[in-house]
Regions:
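N-terminal "arm"/small-domain region of PLP-dependent enzymes with the aminotransferase-like
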Residues: 2-3, 12-75, 208
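PLP-dependent enzyme catalytic core of the Aspartate aminotransferase-like
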Residues: 55-58, 62, 66-70, 74, ...
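Conserved N-terminal alpha-helix of the aminotransferase class I/II PLP-enzyme fold
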Residues: 65-113
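Conserved PLP-anchoring active-site segment centered on the Schiff-base-forming lysine
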Residues: 122-142
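Active-site PLP attachment segment
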Residues: 224, 230-265
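Conserved PLP-binding catalytic core of the aspartate aminotransferase-like
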Residues: 301-311, 316-352, 367, 374-376
């Protein structure tokens, strides 16, 4: 059998639909963010990155860079093994203590990515707890969906951000069910924020565990960057808080926080933790410094919110359709996969602006978008240039000026 023919047929379909993904080859440069060097031979040598998840530019912060450099000099490059076999470094334990403190929990546990932390934790909870039923928000991230699927626990989908529907679904479950309510704080593609207080109240009413993904909120919200749960004063009422080190903290890795028994349970049974090499100590050291900095500093968050507000106001003024939400994520709606790809290509090649088109399956068909994430290091001149480019392209590509 010619397997390549099978592969190529499905890739061909993706391309015809306009959903084939093309990666921009960039080279981040210390001290220059959001500018980056592009290795596209047909485009400009320098581009402005408008879609990074390094939301606060902490991956470029001098203290974070120095912490990683110092740790490499002291510890070398790799962890040397799994956490179970020679791979638990002092830097890992220090970072876990920093994370537990961030969320006001007894313990924390590190993973190699936010995807893995969700997948490993949810699959372990669902498979090991008796009569487990996981109630999942309809728009939960793929990592949560895959973890739930892998657990083989009973799954109940509740309407997105709808506590009343969650209440009905919980009430219909048998009394002996171990109920786990899984949801996010900030949803990455629409940028909406969950009605967390209402969800927590419903879960408590039915004796359910709460599993909260704060991936797009940690570092960004709350007086110390503890996320939306900290900002609302709800962290102590949530059973498990999951987050990432790869977005606002600018490094890489994922984690969970919770009670000591909960974290020990996941540590002891989660295959995604047990059977993989630990994060490099230098990564852990840099992440700890980034978290500690954002616990104290408000400057990055304040500047970032100011730039988000400025861009939203400018888009409103020129009628560029974008989703109205209270978060830092600005989805500009195109609603056509081919045009979305074309817009991104022209922005890159003609204007030196890099934004990745977001198409199916990341978002539903017909909701294709350009997802902008203004940061504290974007200048007012960067915003002016982006708005000028979007104004030009909306006319050139005949896209409607309408409310998203």
């Amino acid at each position: 059998m010619d397997f390549d023919t099978l592969f190529e047929a499905q890739i061909k379909t993706l391309k015809e639909e306009g959903n084939y993904r093309i990666f921009a080859e960039l080279e981040r440069q210390v001290g220059a963010f959001p500018k980056a060097r592009s290795h596209d031979p047909d485009g400009p040598e320098e581009v402005t990155v408008w879609c990074s998840n390094d939301y606060l530019g902490m991956g470029q912060h001098p203290k974070v860079v120095k912490a990683m450099q110092d740790a490499v000099g002291a510890c070398g490059c790799g962890a040397g093994g799994t956490r179970n076999i020679s791979g638990t470094n002092h830097q890992h334990k220090q970072l876990e203590a920093e994370l537990a403190d961030l969320h006001g929990k007894e313990a924390a546990l590190l993973f190699t990515s936010g995807y893995v932390s969700n997948w490993a934790a949810l699959s372990t909870l669902g498979s090991r707890l008796p009569n487990a039923v996981i109630l999942s928000d309809a728009l939960n991230h793929a990592s949560m969906i895959e973890g739930i699927r892998h657990s083989r626990a009973e799954k109940v989908i509740w309407k997105h951000n709808d506590p009343e529907d969650l209440d009905r679904k919980l009430a219909a479950l048998p009394a002996n069910a171990t109920k786990i309510v899984a949801f996010e704080s900030v949803y990455s593609m629409d940028g909406d924020i969950s009605p967390m207080a209402e969800i927590v109240e419903v879960a408590e009413k039915h004796g359910a565990m709460t599993y909260l993904d704060e991936v797009h909120a940690v570092g960004m919200y709350g007086p110390r960057g503890g996320g939306v749960s900290e900002e609302l004063g709800l962290a102590d009422r949530i059973t498990l808080i999951e987050g990432t080190l790869g977005k606002a903290y600018g490094v890489m890795g994922g984690y969970i926080t919770g009670s000591e028994p909960l974290c020990d349970f996941i540590r002891s049974f989660a295959s995604g933790f047990i059977f993989t090499t630990a994060l490099p100590p230098a990564v852990a050291a840099a992440a700890r410094v980034s978290i500690a900095h954002l616990k104290q500093s408000q400057m990055e968050r304040a500047r970032q919110r100011m730039q988000v507000r400025k861009l939203r106001e400018r888009l409103n003024a020129i009628g560029i359709p974008h989703l109205d939400n209270p978060s830092h994520i600005i989805p500009v709606m195109v609603k056509d996969p081919v045009k979305c790809r074309q817009l991104a290509d022209i922005l890159m090649q003609d204007f030196g602006i890099y934004v990745q088109p977001i198409n199916y399956p990341t978002v539903p068909k017909g909701t294709e978008r350009l997802r902008f994430t203004p940061g504290p290091l974007h200048s007012d001149e960067d915003i002016d240039h982006l708005v000028m480019a979007l104004t030009t392209l909306w006319k050139r590509c005949a896209i409607a000026h309408a409310v998203a």
